């Protein structure tokens, strides 16, 4: 029997410009990010970062760290939103690069964007 619960608990992106990316994920994608500094000597995730943790239901932590080398590129992450039309307008106003606007999916509506480092961010509104 494994000690691993096989459940995602953290997503971390290393970004080229932490201030710019923090503003995009906060203002454009609606995440309540908090800036802090881990000075624990960890070469992978030490240093300045902006993060949010969801604690209702299953715990999940999302963080942006200033890249110490090449930033994370080509990853994809998705967030649930209450109103996709409003979220879409907010994402574009904050500088997200549009991949596709809101489209109907079997589970609701979704739209996709690229962040400043080329990662894909999907915003999804559940079907009523």
Task: Identify the meaning behind each predicted range.
Residues 44, 61, 78, 99, ...:
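Short hydrophobic/aromatic beta-strand element in the GNAT-like acyltransferase core
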Residues 24, 85-90:
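Short amphipathic alpha-helices within nucleic acid-binding modules
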Residues 5-6, 12-59:
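Core segments of cupin and vicinal oxygen chelate
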Residues 39-43, 72-73, 105-109:
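Short acidic/glycine-enriched loop/turn segments that link adjacent beta-strands
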């Amino acid at each position: 029997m494994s000690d691993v619960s096989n459940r995602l608990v953290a997503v971390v992106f290393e970004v080229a410009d932490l201030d710019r990316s923090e503003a995009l994920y906060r203002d454009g994608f609606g995440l309540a990010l908090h800036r802090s500094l881990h000075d624990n000597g960890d070469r992978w995730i030490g240093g300045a970062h902006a993060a949010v943790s969801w604690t209702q239901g299953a715990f999940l932590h999302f963080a942006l760290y200033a890249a110490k080398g090449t930033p994370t590129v080509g990853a994809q992450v998705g967030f649930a939103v209450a109103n996709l039309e409003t979220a879409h307008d907010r994402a574009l106003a904050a500088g997200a690069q549009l991949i596709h606007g809101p489209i109907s999916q079997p589970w609701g509506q979704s739209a996709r964007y690229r962040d400043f480092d080329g990662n894909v961010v999907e915003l999804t509104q559940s079907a009523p």
